[in-house]
């Protein structure tokens, strides 16, 4: 999985260290040539420009059916406020698909746990996104194991689309996820995507 937080116009968003499109495209092309076919971005990376750059590069260098594209929803982008309400999720996926230039994403991930929105509202909206064909699967990121377990239980109870992946902070130094999150994911058959924001998830 190639984390795409590094790709984005430096004058957009909060990270002036990101690579603009002309510098990002050769890296994405080389990654594809090297066999990498999973690209993970987010609606908030560089105010949406990461999705734009990744989408254009993949259209030019790969066939859609040969790549896995994941994006995320939660953080504020433009006039879209932070959160995981139904309205925010439905608008965010449409905005992401427009920026990516795609009809669907393979995985739509919730970037954080939203303490201001009932989790049932979030999960039902995600289920509707899957039913509409705008995301094939859904994933989660950056939350406590107890929260993830609660969400998985509710999805089973209501027959909603279930999370198939968890992206959490995990590396050789920070191994807290081995205590609860990784055993939970193993038990539930959930794939783990290692996230290390300071190294752009690579």
Where are these regions (language model features)?
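N-terminal binding-site loop/beta-alpha segment at the start of enzyme catalytic domains
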Residues: 1-67, 103, 131
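Conserved, mostly hydrophobic/aromatic
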Residues: 2, 24, 31, 39, ...
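Active-site beta-loop-alpha junctions enriched in small/polar residues
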Residues: 5-7, 42-44, 72-76, 110-113, ...
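Active-site mouth loops of central-metabolism enzymes
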Residues: 8-22, 75-90, 111-117
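Short, acidic/polar
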Residues: 17-31, 82-101, 121, 148-153
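Short loop/turn motifs at secondary-structure junctions
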Residues: 35, 101-104, 109, 134, ...
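Short amphipathic alpha-helices and their capping/turn segments at secondary-structure boundaries
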Residues: 52-63, 92-98, 180-189
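Beta/alpha (TIM)-barrel catalytic core signal, keyed to glycine-rich beta->alpha loops juxtaposed to Asp/Glu
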Residues: 114-200
């Amino acid at each position: 999985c190639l984390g795409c937080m590094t790709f984005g116009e430096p004058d957009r968003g909060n990270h002036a260290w990101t690579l603009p499109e002309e510098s990002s495209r050769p890296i994405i092309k080389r990654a594809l040539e090297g066999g990498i076919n999973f690209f993970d971005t987010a609606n908030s990376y560089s105010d949406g420009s990461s999705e734009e750059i990744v989408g254009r590069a993949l259209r030019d260098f790969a066939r859609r059916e040969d790549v896995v594209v994941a994006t995320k929803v939660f953080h504020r982008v433009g006039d879209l406020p932070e959160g995981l309400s139904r309205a925010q999720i439905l608008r965010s996926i449409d905005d992401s698909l427009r920026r990516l230039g795609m009809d669907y994403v393979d995985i739509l991930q919730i970037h954080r746990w939203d303490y201001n929105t009932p989790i049932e509202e979030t999960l039902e909206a995600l289920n509707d996104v899957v039913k509409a064909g705008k995301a094939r699967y859904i994933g989660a990121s950056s939350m406590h194991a107890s929260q993830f377990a609660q969400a998985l239980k509710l999805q089973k109870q209501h027959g909603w689309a279930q999370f198939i992946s968890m992206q959490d902070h995990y590396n050789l130094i920070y191994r807290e996820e081995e205590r609860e999150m990784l055993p939970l994911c193993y038990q539930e058959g959930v794939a783990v995507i290692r996230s290390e924001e300071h190294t752009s998830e690579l």
